[in-house]
C-alpha cells in the first residue's frame, strides 16, 4: 500500500509568522527519503497554507508524483494545467471550514465533474475525486461520461469516532469502486491506529495522511514519523 504525505501544515507553520521557513519543499524531500510514495498538497482558494509558488517548486523539484488537491473552480483548473501534476484531487471547499468537511456531491455535480475529467485528461493529468463512503453517491460515478482515475474515500467520520459499522462502510465503498475499475485511495484524519485498520481493507491501494504526521513530527521528527507510518502500513 502506498503512502501519500500531505505537507500543507508545514506551510501553515511558515505562514503563521510570515517567514520563509519551514520550507514545504524540504519537508517533501525528507518525507520522500523516509519512504513516502507521493506528495499531496491542497492549494486552497484563500491560500491559507500552500501557495502557488510552493506547487510549482514541488513539481519542478521532487522525485515522486505530486498530487494537487483543488476545488472545482476555473482558477484552480487553469493552475493545474500550468503545473501539470501527476494527479489532481477534486475536493469540496468552504472558506469558513478549518479542514475539508466531507466528500463531493456527485449526485448534483456529475455533469460538471465529467467535463473536468475530460479537460484534465486532455492535459495528461490524472483525476481523483474525494467522496464519502456512501454507495448512493458512488452509484453516480456510472453517470460520468469519462471515469476518474482514482476515488479517494473520505475517512474523517470513521477516524473521529471509530466503529466497525463505519469501517464496513469504507470497505463496501472500496469494493464498489474496484468493481467500476477505478483505483481506490483513502484519507482524512488517519493516525497510526487507523492506518493499521485501513491496510486490512481490500482494494485500497494508498492512504493520504497529513495533519497527524506533521503533528507527530513536532515531537519525533518528520523522517522518523513517515518511516514509522510506512512500517505500520507494511505490517
Curated annotation (Swiss-Prot):
This is Pyridoxine 5'-phosphate synthase. One of its GO terms (cellular component) is cytosol. Its EC number is 2.6.99.2. 1-deoxy-D-xylulose 5-phosphate binds at residues 8-9, 44, 49, 99. Keywords: Cytoplasm, Pyridoxine biosynthesis, Transferase. 3-amino-2-oxopropyl phosphate binds at residues 6, 17, 189, 210-211. It comes from Wolbachia pipientis wMel. It is an enzyme of class 2 (transferase). The gene is pdxJ. Transmembrane segments: none annotated. It catalyses: 3-amino-2-oxopropyl phosphate + 1-deoxy-D-xylulose 5-phosphate = pyridoxine 5'-phosphate + phosphate + 2 H2O + H(+). The lineage of its organism: Bacteria, Pseudomonadati, Pseudomonadota, Alphaproteobacteria, Rickettsiales.
Amino acid at each position: 500500500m502506498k503512502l501519500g504525505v500531505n505537507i500543507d501544515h508545514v506551510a501553515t507553520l511558515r505562514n503563521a509568522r510570515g517567514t520563509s521557513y519551514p520550507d514545504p519543499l524540504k519537508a517533501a524531500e525528507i518525507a520522500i527519503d523516509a519512504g513516502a510514495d507521493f506528495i499531496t498538497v491542497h492549494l486552497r482558494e484563500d491560500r491559507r497554507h500552500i501557495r502557488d509558488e510552493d506547487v510549482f517548486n514541488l513539481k519542478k523539484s521532487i522525485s515522486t508524483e505530486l498530487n494537487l488537491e483543488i476545488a472545482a473552480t476555473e482558477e484552480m483548473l487553469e493552475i493545474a494545467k500550468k503545473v501539470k501534476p501527476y494527479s489532481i484531487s477534486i475536493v469540496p471547499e468552504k472558506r469558513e471550514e478549518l479542514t475539508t468537511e466531507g466528500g463531493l456531491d456527485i449526485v448534483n455535480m456529475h455533469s460538471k465533474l465529467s467535463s473536468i475529467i475530460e479537460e484534465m485528461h486532455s492535459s495528461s493529468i490524472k483525476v481523483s475525486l474525494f467522496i464519502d463512503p456512501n454507495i448512493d453517491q458512488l452509484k453516480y460515478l456510472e453517470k460520468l461520461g469519462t471515469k476518474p482515475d482514482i476515488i479517494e474515500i473520505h475517512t474523517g467520520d470513521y477516524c473521529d469516532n471509530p466503529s466497525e459499522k463505519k469501517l464496513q462502510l469504507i470497505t463496501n465503498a472500496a469494493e464498489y469502486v474496484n468493481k467500476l475499475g477505478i483505483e481506490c485511495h483513502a484519507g482524512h484524519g488517519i493516525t497510526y491506529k487507523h492506518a493499521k485498520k485501513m491496510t486490512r481493507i481490500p482494494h485500497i491501494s494508498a492512504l493520504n495522511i497529513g495533519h497527524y504526521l506533521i503533528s507527530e513530527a513536532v515531537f519525533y521528527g518528520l523522517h522518523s514519523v513517515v518511516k514509522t507510518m510506512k512500517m505500520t502500513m507494511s505490517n
